[in-house]
C-alpha cells in the first residue's frame, strides 16, 4: 500500500473502521497506478526471482523486503503483471503476503516505492473523501439567513471523482501510453 492505515491515522482523525480505510487506500493505489501508467518500481530495481507455493514465496536469493513493503509480482518473458501485494512476514528464504496469491514458478518480485509527495497526496485525497464525498451533488444549502455554497464537481472541475486541484501531485509521475 502507498500508506498504512496507522500512518494515515497520524494525519487524519476518523471513526471509520480500519478495514474500510485499508480497502479505500488499496483502491486509491490502483487508481493512481492506472491513471499515471506508472508502476513506481524502486530505482535501482530491487527484485528477486521466487516460486510461489501454497501462498509462500520461496527463493534462493537474499530477501530485500521487509514487513509492509509493497511488491509487484510478474511472470514470463513479457513480464505479465500478476498484481501488487503487501508483505506480511519475512522468514529466512521465504516470505508471505497479506493477499491471496496463486501458485507460480519463477515469478519476478519487484519492490514498489512511493515518494513522500505521493503519500501526502493520498492523505489529502482520503481527507477529502472522508469529509466531502457526501456533499458531492449538493450545490448549496440555505437555512434561514445562513447559506453555504459547495465546490462544483461537474465537467472540467473533477477527475476520477476527485477535484482536479487535489490530483496535481500526480503530474510528475505521468508516463506516456502507447
PLM region spans:
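Conserved short "hinge" loops at termini or chain/domain junctions
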Residues: 1-120, 133, 156-178
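Short Cys/His-centered divalent metal-binding micro-motifs
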Residues: 126
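Contiguous, low-complexity intrinsically disordered segments that are highly enriched
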Residues: 136-155
Amino acid at each position: 500500500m502507498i500508506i498504512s492505515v496507522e500512518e494515515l491515522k497520524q494525519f487524519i482523525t476518523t471513526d471509520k473502521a480500519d478495514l474500510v480505510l485499508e480497502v479505500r487506500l488499496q483502491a486509491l493505489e490502483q487508481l493512481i497506478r492506472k491513471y499515471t501508467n506508472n508502476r513506481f518500481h524502486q530505482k535501482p530495481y530491487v527484485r528477486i526471482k521466487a516460486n510461489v507455493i501454497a501462498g509462500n514465496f520461496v527463493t534462493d536469493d537474499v530477501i530485500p523486503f521487509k514487513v509492509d513493503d509493497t511488491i509487484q509480482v510478474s511472470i514470463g518473458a513479457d513480464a505479465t503483471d500478476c498484481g501488487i501485494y503487501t508483505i506480511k512476514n519475512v522468514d529466512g528464504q521465504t516470505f508471505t503476503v497479506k493477499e491471496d496469491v496463486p501458485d507460480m514458478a519463477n515469478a519476478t518480485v519487484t519492490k514498489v516505492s512511493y515518494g513522500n509527495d505521493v503519500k501526502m497526496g493520498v492523505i489529502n485525497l482520503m481527507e477529502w473523501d472522508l469529509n466531502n464525498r457526501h456533499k458531492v451533488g449538493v450545490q448549496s444549502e440555505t437555512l434561514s439567513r445562513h447559506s453555504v455554497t459547495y465546490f462544483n464537481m461537474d465537467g472540467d472541475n473533477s477527475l476520477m471523482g476527485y477535484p482536479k486541484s487535489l490530483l496535481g501531485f500526480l503530474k510528475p509521475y505521468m508516463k506516456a501510453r502507447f
